[in-house]
Amino acid sequence: MNMMTSSILMILILLTTPIIISMTNLPKLIDFPSYATSSIKFSFLLSLLPLLLFFHHNTEYMITNWHWLTINSIKLTMSFKIDYFSILFLSVALFVTWSIMQFSSWYMHSDPHINRFIKYLMMFLITMLILTSANNLFQLFIGWEGVGIMSFLLIGWWYGRADANTAALQAILYNRVGDIGFILAMTWFCLNMNSWELQQIFLTNTNNLVPLTGLLIAATGKSAQFGLHPWLPSAMEGPTPVSALLHSSTMVVAGIFLMIRFHPLTSNNSTIMTAMLCLGAITTLFTAICALTQNDIKKIVAFSTSSQLGLMMVTLGINQPYLAFLHICTHAFFKAMLFMCSGSIIHSLNDEQDIRKMGNMMKAMPFTSSCLIIGSLALTGMPFLTGFYSKDLIIEAINTCNTNAWALMITLIATSMTAVYSMRIIYFVTMTKPRYSPLITINENNPNLINPIKRLALGSILAGFLISLNIPPTNIQILTMPWHLKMTALLITILGFAIALELNNLTLNLSMSKPTKLSSFSTSLGYYPPIMHRIIPQKTLNSSYKLSLNLLDLIWLEKTIPKSTSITQTQLSKMMSNQKGLIKLYFLSFLITISLIFILHTLNPEWFQ
């Protein structure tokens, strides 16, 4: 057994140990959150070994541990694919989860079921790692469904609140739609290629639209692309550590990761590439517009995630899977940090999430505010922060791309809007006058709060540089670009900041005016939730009610038993007799008959002898 295999298996053992321990009585005797945090920390340190080995040798590995069963000629084995995507994602996910886990021990300290919460977070991470390292579709599907069910349990953690239950159900139902696409693709591969192994699928490389459409539907559901996006802002009902983990390195990037994993198939199909490009462009613009008018700090960050996922889908649409993966890795650092800074501020202000009731947090919480600003600047692609290394490359690739100009244009507009809503958070939360109660006592001295944010702040500054150094050489030709194209990313970011600052200054002291149609559109999330969650279900319910009324009450209960019985009896009686119910006529006929008999008897009595 070589060093790569043994270190990967050691990481797996380290991560599963806390879950096994949680099934015994040991968590009552030890500090379970600290134990789980330590196990993830050591897993991260251990994951650096295979990462450096991979960068040194640049060789992919496949670890096959256990042959499960054979169905006809399909072999199902538990095998791990250790390539550039899975090995780098392993280290990034472990680093981010280490910080989130430590943050959870501070944020959830008063929760009576904190041990179970930590266990769920661990399982969430493990299912995501199963998904990223799977070498066959069956194993990938186990990770896919595991991520879905764990998100359901964690979003609905505070199950006493109706909103949390609704949000959890919403997440699982929208993901069911995506799962239909995944199962469709699995079925097609099974029937046509007789295998679920990724190598076999890529080797045959049939340019068929059906499985790729199924995979795109799956990615749309899991990564909250336009059409199946409403569950993502609703998922903010869960605790802040859940939001941080869900949006940074698990769940929402699973759909994008799936499309990256299948890029050898998608790159040969221009139809699916165009579909990905247009879908991503619509998503990134729509969610950026929605983020502009939100007042809940967590919802703004959630919509920013959705917008970045749209940008990743656009990157896949212009056939740049390595760039999309680079953006996943860089995005994980500052997005987790933004959520943790938001959670720290919310916790300190007695669970206040409205940015209009914050202000001047730079004086009250200098460390958290500084990290919030670093995260927001990294999100906008400020030069030499982490986001710049992926976002700048993506915008350069968009500028030099020769497909679909409208999709690329609205992507650039949405990128400019990123700066607008990031500036809005900075302005309302850290600047201006304080708008919260002076009785609130604020304390940010807990090491379980400071250390995780500090680590992620460091990652938000350096990680992009370190990761971009290690992108494997690709066959993309080196381009020389005019300076105005090269500076596009920076220019649209600065433009967004300038517009946001000017608008914030203009609207700070103005009285409330009647909202415009565009403002109403953005505030009500494009009227999508009322249409999808109110009008369509109501119409469906009404039509179902009328249909069931006609089928059950009018047809079955009335016409089948009571009416059919009476109609049958009437028809039979009409066939069997001609009586019409005319009593006088009947008596008259009796009278005539009796009179005739009497007369005949009188005239001829011998006839009756």
Swiss-Prot record:
It is an enzyme of class 7 (translocase). It is found in: Mitochondrion inner membrane. Keywords: Electron transport, Membrane, Mitochondrion, Mitochondrion inner membrane, NAD, Respiratory chain, Translocase, Transmembrane, Transmembrane helix, Transport, Ubiquinone. GO terms for biological process: electron transport coupled proton transport; mitochondrial electron transport, NADH to ubiquinone; mitochondrial respiratory chain complex I assembly; response to hydrogen peroxide; response to hypoxia. Signal peptide: none annotated. It catalyses: a ubiquinone + NADH + 5 H(+)(in) = a ubiquinol + NAD(+) + 4 H(+)(out). GO terms for cellular component: mitochondrial inner membrane; respiratory chain complex I. It holds the Pfam family Proton_antipo_M. Its main location: mitochondrion. The chain crosses the membrane at residues 6-26, 35-55, 84-104, 116-138, 140-160, 171-191, 240-260, 272-292, 300-319, 330-350, 365-385, 409-429, 456-476, 481-501, 581-601. InterPro entries: NADH_DH_su5_C, NADHpl_OxRdtase_5_subgr, ND/Mrp_TM, NU5C-like, Proton_antipo_N. Its EC number is 7.1.1.2. Belongs to the complex I subunit 5 family. Core subunit of respiratory chain NADH dehydrogenase (Complex I) which is composed of 45 different subunits. Core subunit of the mitochondrial membrane respiratory chain NADH dehydrogenase (Complex I) which catalyzes electron transfer from NADH through the respiratory chain, using ubiquinone as an electron acceptor. Essential for the catalytic activity and assembly of complex I. This is NADH-ubiquinone oxidoreductase chain 5. The lineage of its organism: Eukaryota, Metazoa, Chordata, Craniata, Vertebrata.
